[in-house]
UniProtKB/Swiss-Prot annotation:
Pfam families noted in UniProt: PsbK
Keywords in alphabetical order: Chloroplast, Membrane, Photosynthesis, Photosystem II, Plastid, Reaction center, Thylakoid, Transmembrane, Transmembrane helix
Family from the record: Belongs to the PsbK family.
Keyword GTP-binding annotated: no
GO biological process entries: photosynthesis
Propeptide position ranges: 1-11
HAMAP family found in the cross-reference section: PSII_PsbK
Lineage of the species this protein comes from: Eukaryota, Discoba, Euglenozoa, Euglenida, Spirocuta
Protein name: Photosystem II reaction center protein K
Transmembrane parts of this sequence: 23-43
InterPro entries tied to this protein: PSII_PsbK (IPR003687), PSII_PsbK_sf (IPR037270)
Subcellular localization, as worded in the UniProt entry: Plastid, Chloroplast thylakoid membrane
Amino acid sequence: MFPSTNQEVLALLPEAYAPFDPIVDVLPIIPLLFLLLAFVWQASVKFR
């Protein structure tokens, strides 16, 4: 019925988002950075 099916649209998404691949690779690390930041902050206030 429609010329472009869902499969065709989904197949094009990785190509469209290819420039963002380096950013996506770094995203899972961000929460770990917040965890490390908490320790650095507590060390700076001497864990009071």
